[in-house]
Amino acid sequence: MQMDNDFIKKLGYRALDNRLKRISDRMSHDTRKFFKQIDIDVEPSWHLVFKLLGEYKTLTMVEIAQQLGYTHPSMVVMLKKMTTKGYIVSEQDSIDKRKQNLRLTQKSIDLLPDLELIWHSCEDAIFKMLNEDLSILDRLDEIEESLKSIPFNERFYNEYQKQKI
């Protein structure tokens, strides 16, 4: 029996989440390979933290999570790895002792010019991969806004209830 080589693609919109994850995983994997190739010990997902702390200098974990729309647990893992690698430091807030302020280390600050060049090259590669057509971003914005207004689990549950009738 001949099998279709791309089951996810064959399913179309019914596997949208899997397809988006596959694209994301592929880009992250390839970016990780690129960083190894140029001997820079950075994870692809860290670039947004570098950019935020480069711009704002000091932020709390909660502020970073809010800016990126990430969950607190995923931020804890990411920021711990960045701290372990010596890219960020955590300092107790002088006013609110419960808060930990995060900032880039000198190692990160020294690396920023190289990272800026890398990010610009990555942006150019993405732009060209999209054939200079950024309309996909508008569609992604619509999907994200739609999910904010009615979470997917509610949509899913409503459709499930209709099917049961």
Positions of predicted regions on the chain:
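N-terminal leader segment of winged-helix/HTH proteins
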Residues: 1-39
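Alpha-helical linker/hinge and terminal dimerization helices associated
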Residues: 27-34, 68, 111-130, 143-150, ...
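Alpha-helix boundary/capping and short turn/kink residues
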Residues: 25, 39-40, 58, 116, ...
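N-terminal positioning helix adjacent to the helix-turn-helix/winged-helix DNA-binding module
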Residues: 12, 16, 45-46, 107
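N-terminal helix-turn-helix DNA-binding core of bacterial DNA-binding proteins
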Residues: 29-71
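C-terminal regulatory/oligomerization modules of transcriptional regulators
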Residues: 1-8, 132-165
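Charged, amphipathic alpha-helical coiled-coil/dimerization segments
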Residues: 80-138
